């Protein structure tokens, strides 16, 4: 590989210090640079190990107000934008976002690539009404059935839609899985799993870890599905005893190394890691943190927002103060700091997503030019109608604003590279 006359270790040391946006620009300068950056597994692994996440948050039911807070930067006033179309964030994985902007969309904000996904062939997401109009048919409260997965080797993405089905036994639930590949082809997996009856926790997002999408159920067990191998399993685990003992807040999340569970009271925050998932699963307590941010008597609401193994995030709303506050705990420095704010009109239905910029994800699948007019044929019992879904300037401008806002994370992502 060309290294501009520099020894390879020194050249890589320079690349490791680049923020994600600068690294993407470097890939475009020479073909040999692009090959080394994109294809060398050692380089990708070491570079990503030094990239820090940021935080995206928006109303769980969709909003035109999107907020972004880079970890380690408390200048929150500039990390907010008004979108042109009501948007929901449904997932974040390996630098990609799964969005709902009048339809499903996968985007890599760093590379500015995106793709609107055709859901007309989905068994679980589409429905033709009596007028022959194709509609997206997933109620707001069931949006957590959708999960985003990115293959860590090929960097290709897949979207998984999980469907719950009742069985003849009222004490059992059967789960089905539909998979969307990058070419917008929906396929019903032959895999089903039947297990003890329980429901998903509505306000808990699915979590991607180690090739699989994981859903937390109300009985504490975890449903897992790998879209590559199409293997499904139920992890028979209960909530930690501390969660059952007192009324508190909790979060289901993942780090680079493990699935994680956070439970918090006004005094103490417990961090758990899942151990022995295949044999004897249990939540092992790995850290306790003093809750130093929810002591204010004027707080009307607070909760755990996000966790990635490096930062723990809490947010709180006050009774008499205009804006709420987003707090971050740096687990390496063992200290709290302010990440940003939340407007006073936000209620408890506010969703937070860790977002880590990645110059590697789905460069092929999202490199295609998006056709702004998608025509879908819908057939019913009486006629055939042509339905035109227009991706107009407002859809594109909404995406551009999301991408521009997440650019705020990139300069901070490598600011503490060692």
From Swiss-Prot:
InterPro entries: F-box-assoc_interact_dom (IPR017451), F-box-like_dom_sf (IPR036047), F-box_dom (IPR001810), SCF_F-box_component (IPR050796). SUPFAM superfamilies: F-box domain (SSF81383). Residues 1-46 form the F-box domain. Coiled coil: none annotated. This is Putative F-box protein At1g20795. It comes from Arabidopsis thaliana (Mouse-ear cress).
